[in-house]
């Protein structure tokens, strides 16, 4: 009989591995998000913007396609699932996956689910099943990407929210809060991109740990993250 204790790790403290691999970028159009992401090592862009040809990274256009009768031909949920399986195979040379943009992926998932159930909206699918399917599909995608031995970059647009009392304007990701929580809950850093005149600014708004430059093993990634204000703590 197998010794069940053999599957347990040794009972002693482990040295944390702090190297970040999952990133969430958001900002206004033309703030440099896709350009920045394209400099990650050996990137593959899963593109929804229709501007993949303008970048240097190899890209796959993610989309739902339809038959003449309006029924679903290509399902974006299954398309992305197949891509993840392909990236899991031996000999794959890609080292970064870019999801550009995650907002559109959520919209496509919703559209695919509604078509599958012949509903106009998720609310029309009984017992909340539509919302459950969308949440599950997004969670599965994020977890599958995170499990890859690669860097993963999610890109989102931004919204401006102005407080009527104070007049203060804050810039937040356009991704709905419940989906934002699913994605960023599996990310190591959130980076806000802005462009003022000809200057591009990158500010880390959230991070999982107090990273040091020594935590980053890949020189190309280190160079990218070093350009983001607030990424590294107490280091010049």
Q: Residue locations for each model-derived region?
A:
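Conserved acidic residues
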Residues: 43, 95, 150-151, 188
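Hydrophobic, Leu/Ile/Phe/Ala-enriched alpha-helical segments that form helix-helix packing faces
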Residues: 84-88, 141-145, 187
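Charged phosphate-binding loop/patch that engages nucleotide di/tri-phosphates or the phosphate backbone
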Residues: 217-236
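Phosphate-binding/switch region of NTP-binding enzymes
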Residues: 152-223
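P-loop NTPase motor core
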Residues: 96, 101-182
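Intrinsic-disorder-associated interaction segments
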Residues: 73-76, 127, 218
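A general structural signal for short secondary-structure junctions and capping/turn motifs
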Residues: 15, 35-37, 90, 144-145, ...
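Conserved P-loop
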Residues: 2-99, 103-108
